[in-house]
Amino acid sequence: MQLYTYLYLLVPLVTFHLILGTGTLDHGGALTERRSTDAIALKPEPVLLQKSSARSTDDNGNDRLTQMKRILKKRGNKARGEEEVAKMAAELAREDAVNGK
């Protein structure tokens, strides 16, 4: 009978402690505040990329985007189109066939 008396007194105390410990009844209805805080905490932060990490580099460690800009500036911004590249590849293939490579 003594065990039931202790449990009768202990269970409400433990329950009340757990409720206050989780913050569901703390400050009068903090359950919604806590959920919104958790939602904000779980929201991913934006990734801020630095220029050096966002751009790829070649084998020499040079920035490819910067190199391409320099090349285009030297050409006078006359970038080769796909047709010009295809013609150049066909000419190189013919030269290789003629030279016996």
From Swiss-Prot:
GO terms for cellular component: extracellular region; host cell postsynaptic membrane. Its main location: secreted. It is found in: Secreted. Divalent cations stabilize the toxin the in alpha-helix conformation. The modification Asparagine amide is found at N99. A divalent metal cation binds at E91, E95. PROSITE patterns: CONANTOKIN (PS60025). Residues 1-21 form the signal peptide. Expressed by the venom duct. Residues 22-80 form a propeptide. The keyword Calcium applies. Keywords: Amidation, Calcium, Gamma-carboxyglutamic acid, Ion channel impairing toxin, Ionotropic glutamate receptor inhibitor, Magnesium, Metal-binding, Neurotoxin, Postsynaptic neurotoxin, Secreted, Signal, Toxin. The modification 4-carboxyglutamate is found at E83, E84, E91, E95. One of its GO terms (molecular function) is metal ion binding. The keyword Secreted applies. Its cofactor is Ca(2+); Mg(2+). InterPro entries: Conantokin_CS. Conantokins inhibit N-methyl-D-aspartate (NMDA) receptors. This toxin is far less potent as an anticonvulsant compound than conantokin-R. It induces sleep-like symptoms in mice. Belongs to the conotoxin B superfamily. The mature peptide does not contain cysteine residue. This is Conantokin-L. It comes from Conus lynceus (Lynceus cone).
